């Protein structure tokens, strides 16, 4: 009996020992399958602080850059009109140097539905693009003009929209900058079908796709599906989440809404879109969080996904 008990103890000890010996091999095999390091260098737009090309609103550019820099985002985007206003006072270059956060892109809205304005619009877009270029920006986000959606008929303006986008994109790329269509709610290109119709018809040699994934979701589309369908053309992106609540025009800090952000980020990383992803959240007077708190919440979410920030 004693011999049998000793044998059982021996076999149990051996089994435990073999299990312990096998564990490092399993861990080593698992380690080899770890997700590759994230490469995206994610930036932030400035509208969260209320930075718009309106009298007085451009004053918020400095608080925006201060917070964007403090939280280690890699670059910023704003309106060229805002940049120009600060530059004319000799304050922009020193401010960018002070906060050590580079300009990546400028946001320009162009009239796409009125051919009589085309010539003047081209001149205006070129002038604003040169402001972006002056401060080492590399991308122009080309947005459609606003319309009254309840009475708007896309098909009536389809040809003008495509023609205008081709003209504007050619003018921007002639400067050596890249540009892409940025669909937006409340404009002449909002819905999924409008986006597909336009992107399948424009000259994509010049005009790429610069989607706002939150705007896509709010407009009724599956943002991840749209990004997947046009992935080879995606050269810039506004990374935004959508919750449909009363704050921030229905948007929210990343990770709090319905947009499939991990899938979208993995897709854009797979095609090498390293420096042209911009977090964005609309401003909200008396919102539940300060702009800085929304940035910190979003940053924490991105860090959980493996993204890194400047230190």
Tell me the role of every PLM-derived stretch.
Residues 2-25, 30-43, 48, 53-69, ...:
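Histidine-acidic metal/acid-base catalytic patches
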Residues 48-50, 80-82, 109-112, 144-148, ...:
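Active-site-proximal loop/turn and secondary-structure-junction residues that shape catalytic pockets
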Residues 34-38, 65-70, 85-105, 126-136, ...:
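Acidic (Asp/Glu)-rich catalytic clusters
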Residues 14-23, 34, 98-102, 115-209, ...:
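Active-site acidic/histidine proton-transfer and metal-coordination neighborhood
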Residues 85-92, 117-119, 154, 288:
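Metal-dependent catalytic neighborhoods of phosphoester/phosphodiester hydrolases
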Residues 110-118, 252-255:
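The substrate-binding groove and active-site-proximal loops of carbohydrate-active enzymes
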Residues 75-81, 179-183, 210-212:
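Short catalytic-loop micro-motif centered on adjacent basic/acidic residues
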